[in-house]
């Protein structure tokens, strides 16, 4: 009986087993595929990240200030540098910052350029890179490039350009996106070695619009830019308010009285003159003074009205003094000058997380960087460094492990150097929509890789007084 049941049910069991095996294999394959997809997009990696907090460390692990200070004073540090960019300069212009006419420069512009971008460099020379944009503000523009392997024709063309314009520095590293940190630090090294006589240094990609005028305005008063430029309008509005609200009733005095009393106004008291102009236009007193009045009556009226006039002048003079004091207080903002030892690292500041999906151009593995956040950093399309910040960050970089993304690397260096990146909205890391009148306070805008577009926009803004 049992044997009979087995024979009858065996085909059913075999069919069920085969079906279950197929279903099980299907789900196993689906699960494996899902795991691979999640891993590709970094889902599991995020769970393994270390929290970025006050205990953050990045090689070299430890305080580096003492070592940096030793290097800056040409002394041997207790710990040797762990990261130096020892590349050879194929094209050098070490005399670029030596000029008998200028002992120092206000700004040196360092343009990170690709070797083949000849037209972009030419457009920059003819716009914001023109070194005599303002005759009373000495500046220099320097292009930094790498090399292309086995492209002798391109190299020869670059050498001709360098010989003609004498504004190109070339080092023997491969010019590619993932070597931007090398390009940046080669620039730092060259500046520290050959061009320390500038108060500020601006690093810019060769596809950026730059307003030289706004750069100079910004470095004059970074904390209040661009608001402090709007103050004169406020002062002007205040003047008009005083003029309208404090105008008293007409005194009714004719010109003869003012001439008789020989009232003299200071040339600078334009506000008094303006307010008195309306006050001294009526001839009401002529209606009051008839020929029947005797000299005593006339003298009495003259004294009364003269006293009233003098009080008016006194009141208006007080307004002028108040306005002058107000303007002087405002002018202190305009004339603000950063101290020589300020450590300014300014641009558009970001706080973001590493890209963990492997398809990303900016993918970073846990072995490269294990934390869930980057240190605060500045997008490196355009940023400004004071001389002190440049020196401090250059020597600190020698104790910072190399990282292939230059903006992140400089963020790591700044954190080690205890330099807080300074944020300004007018450094546009994207291409700001252009209209004729919305670039008034723009310092930089990305997306101007077309030389003709840069020329057109920059020249239009220059004509408006914004570039």
Regions found by a protein language model. Name each.
Residues 2-467:
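Secretory-pathway lumenal glyco-enzymes, predominantly type II signal-anchor Golgi glycosyltransferases
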